[in-house]
Amino acid sequence: MEDFVRQCFNPMIVELAEKAMKEYGEDPKIETNKFAAICTHLEVCFMYSDFHFIDERGESIIVESGDPNALLKHRFEIIEGRDRTMAWTVINSICNTTGVEKPKFLPDLYDYKENRFIEIGVTRREVHIYYLEKANKIKSEKTHIHIFSFTGEEMATKADYTLDDESRARIKTRLFTIRQEMASRGLWDSFVSPREAKRQLKKDLKLQEPCAGSPTKVSHRTSPALKTLEPMWMDSNRTAALRASFLKCPKK
């Protein structure tokens, strides 16, 4: 699973996921299913935001990579992926500027057009069950919830899906592709079932035990099949800016 994640997702996504797990004392090499889940969630958050801007009239528009957008404002503020201190700093700034109610839990995005925080969910289960779990945890009508599944289903607060059909279809297609590729490699069952995941972890750890006197060889090649999974959705200019913003070392 770890190799699949590193080859499947954008390097920035992988780096952010590793950073988030280490912040909570978790090891991506051991908790590989969680590693995959975090990367998937991060990618959906970025895909949700990418190419969506607000023009000078305050209208939401879609601008593909390469088009001039210097005078446009990004519609969504990405909160997910930041360390907790920086995330709350961003939230406090948004609340002070817009006057919106401060959430009790860290949301994933802020929508400058609708003036609301958004909680994104990606589930391997039934969307309505996961939606209710999110709603019961957040206990706030101010935070908008949008749930996606790997089967193409989705559910959102008051059936308000925020994005246009094409943008949501892009996310659903990506999730379905991840599921299919996991399944073709025998990874999907362990990703869905905790019991199967534990069995797979024991198997992986046993396979990782080095034989006495045997040299360890690591391959950095990407298989042709996995090359088709490499995400092409990120705006290169914004990727560089986000990397600098999200991954910079805190000042001592």
Curated annotation (Swiss-Prot):
InterPro entries: PA/PA-X, PA/PA-X_sf. One of its GO terms (molecular function) is RNA binding. It is found in: Host cytoplasm; Host nucleus. Coiled coil: none annotated. The record marks 202-203, 206 as: Important for efficient shutoff activity. Gene3D superfamilies: Influenza RNA-dependent RNA polymerase subunit PA, endonuclease domain (3.40.91.90). Pfam families: Flu_PA. The keyword rRNA-binding does not apply. Plays a major role in the shutoff of the host protein expression by cleaving mRNAs probably via an endonuclease activity. This host shutoff allows the virus to escape from the host antiviral response. Hijacks host RNA splicing machinery to selectively target host RNAs containing introns for destruction. This may explain the preferential degradation of RNAs that have undergone co- or post-transcriptional processing. This is Protein PA-X. It comes from Influenza A virus (strain A/Turkey/Minnesota/501/1978 H6N8). The lineage of its organism: Viruses, Riboviria, Orthornavirae, Negarnaviricota, Polyploviricotina. The gene is PA.
